[in-house]
Amino acid sequence: MKKISTFIITKNEEARIARAINSVKNITDEVIVVDNESTDDTVHIAKTLGAKVIVKPWLGYVGQKSFAESMCVNDWVLNIDADEELSQELQDEIEYIFASHNQDRYLAYQIKLLIMYRGDQKSRMFAPLNKCIRLYNKKFASFANTINSTTHDSVVFNKDVDFIGKIYLLNGIAYHYSGTSIEQLVNKANFYSSEQAKDLVKQGKKFSNFRLATEMIWWFLKAFFIRRYFVFGFDGFVDSIIFAFARFLRLAKLRELSLKSRNVIASDNYINYCMDIKSLLQKKKRSRYPKK
């Protein structure tokens, strides 16, 4: 009746993985956890809760999720992150859709993600809410369809699929819990910005000194006011700064990689130039002093 596989990617998530698995294990046939060589108790906890755990070295966000998706036996798959939890209302809604065999009326379902701040036991009024496809039929859509990025992990439909009117927004919500600590958020910002910078280089993006100078200001204002981090008070102020700093780091690292690439090219060109001069001088010497 269920015919759903859930997949989760993890890295040192011992503090949160149980909550995520417990929120999906009653509505899915299997829970696949693809772990990036955690050094804590993540793998043991996941196995104890009945998940199938596969240890896989890091392939990037898109690569890791694509691999996890491919490990699922069912066509219908549900993806959640280790820091997320389905509400009981959302669990009941998904269970009802599949129990009544109505899931194939649509190709994918969007889920509303409500941001919960560290330590919050209930949601705050006006808290940020994001919508994204997390439940879908992998015959028609996949994380693997994401191109030119290892970081922007999103479900993309196959090119030949007409998905207009085939995506349904579920009424229930899922909770997205923010970082476990400031240290964890800063570490994540550092790692994620490095991955993003590499993506930008692959895409041939150029850095701008003006954007570099204004990036933090713009993204702080966007996070604090437009994304409504102000709802979380001074803690939201701190998180907005970290978020903006991560965006700044992305461009700063792009600049660094671009300059390194230029220096390497310049160095190679100089070496080639010297070799050409040396070859030319040798030719002139041979022409001046021909063999007897």
From Swiss-Prot:
Pfam families, sorted: Glycos_transf_2
Gene3D superfamilies linked to this entry: Spore Coat Polysaccharide Biosynthesis Protein SpsA, Chain A
Disulfides per UniProt: none
Keywords from the UniProt entry: Glycosyltransferase, Transferase
Record carries keyword DNA damage: no
SUPFAM superfamilies: Nucleotide-diphospho-sugar transferases (SSF53448)
InterPro entries reported in the protein's UniProt record: Glyco_trans_2-like (IPR001173), Nucleotide-diphossugar_trans (IPR029044)
Keyword Glycosyltransferase: yes
EC main group: transferase
GO terms assigned for molecular function: glycosyltransferase activity
E.C. numbers: 2.4.-.-
Family listed: Belongs to the glycosyltransferase 2 family. WaaE/KdtX subfamily.
Protein name as annotated: Uncharacterized glycosyltransferase RT0209
Organism: Rickettsia typhi (strain ATCC VR-144 / Wilmington)
Taxon lineage: Bacteria, Pseudomonadati, Pseudomonadota, Alphaproteobacteria, Rickettsiales
